Curated annotation (Swiss-Prot):
InterPro entries: Puta_zinc/iron-chelating_dom, UCP006173. This is UPF0260 protein YcgN. It comes from Salmonella typhimurium (strain LT2 / SGSC1412 / ATCC 700720). Belongs to the UPF0260 family. Pfam families: CxxCxxCC (PF03692). It comes from the Bacteria.
Amino acid sequence: MADTLMSDTPFWQRKTLDEMTDAEWESLCDGCGQCCLHKLMDEDTDEIYFTNVACRQLNIKTCQCRHYERRFEFEPDCIKLTRENLPDFEWLPMTCAYRLLAEGKPLPTWHPLLTGSKAAMHGERISVRHIAVKESEVRDWQDHILNKPSWAE
């Protein structure tokens, strides 16, 4: 009976992030693309400013990396979120499954692991599909800061 209950319980509810396989870890990503938007850091304060400028490798329509398996070859500054460095990424969105599970919170109802597709996530406007712009179209990066500091107003 206990084995049946264990198998009926989704892995993200019965395993810690450290206990997950690499495939389980990867499947937690909802594919919103928020990690793939460029961030700017104030050199004086280390404050991070979020932009709507997409990485060149991000397919804005699908919110997927064009070269995910080889992304570091194409974008040396691309981040790799791991179990070890997760605490360092305080800027992760409040909706991020990695962040939520690390904080002991449940996955949102629109998460692809619960719904079986990304449609609900896109419908809730969690993905960057509706706000992202191509890096090649950007002239002044300050015009694309989403959380503008007072000096940029």
